[in-house]
Amino acid sequence: MDSTVLVESAKTNIHGVDSKAEKQTIFDQLISDIKSQTDGQIPDEVLPDLQQLAEINGLTFEYKPKEKLSIMDHPDPTSVLSQDVFQIRTILSKTLFVDVENEDYSVYIPNDTAKLTPVLIDARPIQTYQPKALMHKDTAILPSHRDEISDQYGTDEILFDSHMFNDISQAQIRDFDTYILDKSIQIQNTLPNLEFISSLEKEVNPFNIHNTLCLNFGQKEYYNIIADRTNLSFQQRRQSVQFDNVIVDGVARTARVSLRLHPFDSQLLDIVRFNVIQDQPLADTLMEYQLVAADGFVATPKFRVDRDARLIADVRSPVMARLCELSPFFHRTRILSSMTDFTPLWKVNVFSSSIDNAKDAIYRMAEISFTVADATTSALASVNVASAQQTLLTLLNLSLFRFEIDPTGSQSNFGSAVSAALMLIVFPTDEQSMSNITFDNLCNLVFNELIAWTVDRPTFVKRTGMTNAFEANVNIGGGNMTRDIIAYMRFVLLRRPWAVFQRTYDDRYVSDIMVPNIDEANVNDQCYVAINNLFNGLIQAAQRNPNPGRQIAATSFRKLLKSMKDSCCNRIIPLIRLLKYNIERIARVYRFFPYTADLVHVIPAFRDERLRVKVPVSGMLSIALGINKAPDSFDWYNLLKFADVVRTKNFADQSLESIMVHALIRNDINPARSKKDYIQQNIKPATNVVASLSKLPSATFTTILADRMLNNEIRRTQSYVVTNRIRDAVRAAFEHVPTAEHGIAKGALLLPIPQNFQRSSVYVRKDNILYDPPVGVDRFNLSDLLDGRFYQGLINRVQNMAPFVISGPLQVKPSDASAIESVTSAYLTMSSPYDACVRPEDLRHNRVVHPPTVDYFSDASITRPNTQFEQLMSKTSVFVIDAPRLIVQNDATVYTFDYKDIQLTTSVVDKLEFTSVKTPDVTLFNGMLVYED
């Protein structure tokens, strides 16, 4: 029986009996029945029912869930078992490369991690804009000058408020420009980044049912205030609202909207067009992708693309480019990142799982028995698939990137010497591509291991001024040194570069695409002839020489040479075709490449800063012996997806610009501030390339950030333009909105003798606010006084009992009616001149040490009799300078916005459908088979 059924029947039985003992017996029986059904466990689904049943009836129910056995002790760190586990785990974590000699894994165990913050492309159309100046209703006051008649409230009016500046503190007054910058950054982070509206909150116009009201942009508040028809103050406004409307044009895709906005909000909406996400038409890129994939595929769009469909632009940040020129470490990190991206794209599965069969055939041909423990069997020991793949990837990457080759592995056996002889033919050996030391080492290896012993010459030892064996011996003929071998050495000493497959379109972003300068069809090409010459000459010399092999028996050596000649000369053509097959296809997306620049032409010193890539010496021979099938057909879907990923990465890298812009502006405001510290504290790296900035040594980073060209590039960015425009708007807004009520004023007029109060606006009875300081009064800027400039002039005005104005943001101390009733310091300040700005501390320093705090008096209460206010607060010597309140306009302004859907995408491949029409054989673009048996 099911557990839930048992519980239900037990409930019925328990309710049927009266005594508690009988209830407990039935309950215990129920629990034992459930446990017998479920191996001593109570199922989770019936446990709450049982607990509830026990609580209701006051029964005892004890149940402890069975815990699974767990090992509490930590494993013994010295135990062999746990060490093996750790070793396996770390090997699996990330295998960097295989040491082809020992077949051991070199394992990369990270010792520190960089947290990446992905860039979320947050699409914010214009209707998401939250207005900074809100609206509120205020009532005018009609003051009475007679005690027996109280003040009256007049008409209502709708005003803009200034709550956006209610967060300025005393510390921010000292550094007001930084406050404005922080405010601008805050606004920039929420500013719309699409220059159109995608939806509107609308409602029927209650004052004209044929029209529509827009409730976005804070307009709902305005319509709510004037909706009270009993309030006759707004009669004129209600008549104006009749003409408010939203007109949508379906052909031009625009919307004309009636809005009442504060000038500050209007300015910010104008700045939106500078803040848009950089994009490009999707249809153009779709067409490009279709053309690229036309090799063996038909790519058709899955659906029709609207004319407003956009794709994020392929932006190449000039700031990143300049950073790469300044920091070799950053440049190498970026190149390495690009190289890692390319690795999965190459089609290199041309090897069988093992080269042992080919090696066995060669050994059999050389009549070597494995029972003979002679050095012959180790001649090809370092030849394996791992080194073949590693070398092939290096060759392919060498066509797109420029890096240094560092040959590794055993360099003292027959196999590596034959392989080095092939390397000197296939790899680019010119000075721009291969360093002199590497070239000399390869030449010396070929000479000492293959040529010297065979032609009966002494082995070559490097000396000053004579470092290359080929140069030393190329002109010394005679003996067994046949002209075939000399022809090979001459050809190698030409140091031939690779041919340019495609020139770069921007050498600061991508380098030329190069390919081996070897014909893929003509077997009489110089390179094949040179290899043939070498082997013919060696075979000829070995026949005349009774002891031609250095470590190998003479017969075996001669036969090894013959079999090597067949393998090497026949397999170079498939290798060249394989390289061209890969490169000519990947070059189709050259326009979408990641960063691959080689900055040697721009900065010659970068020759030593290239990446150094380890190449197994035996790799070329491994390829020659192992290549035995055609590669897979090219997968255009993955290649074009790679182009999408690169575009997204470049877009993410651009996020670095905004943080550098903010650091630069902060430094412009106060040059003593560190740009480096700000960047390191606030950077949220989106890619591992940007994260590598934090690994730069401190002093190096400081000097990089001081670079004039880098700073100029930062000043040319979109982010810099937007931030500066917002700063100007915020500064103008501060000057033109009332802020005294938030504890901050534009300045203060200080008088030697208290003067009578005035009334600044109709919304207060009395206050000490002035909108315009009197003409002819000397002005002092707060920033000057804080720096000690013109302080003596200010003291001079005090001594001469002359009025003066301090302009600049000043903190005010509001004194309300309650403070006035008890005679406080506010009363004293009113009647003692200059007290607000002259302190003994300032006199000692000869400058204003702390920005002065001035008093702000305001009385808006209509209940107080007239004389009561006059007696205490009739005069003051401090007047606060502030801006008048802004009245919301009667008639709406019509704004025209584009009206369309958000159709911004980061991926193009998803919009295409790929249909394969490839031929059964893998061919080059000229129709030649890549591999033919």
UniProtKB/Swiss-Prot annotation:
Single Gene Ontology MF annotation: RNA binding
Keywords, sorted A to Z: Capsid protein, Inner capsid protein, RNA-binding, T=2 icosahedral capsid protein, Virion
Record InterPro entries: Rotavirus_VP2 (IPR007779)
Localization per record: Virion
Subunit note: Homodecamer; each decamer is made up of two conformers of VP2, called VP2A and VP2B. Interacts with a VP1-VP3 complex. Interacts with the intermediate capsid protein VP6. Interacts with NSP5. Interacts (via N-terminus) with NSP2.
Entry's family note: Belongs to the rotavirus VP2 family.
Name of this chain's protein: Inner capsid protein VP2
Lineage, opening ranks: Viruses, Riboviria, Orthornavirae, Duplornaviricota, Resentoviricetes
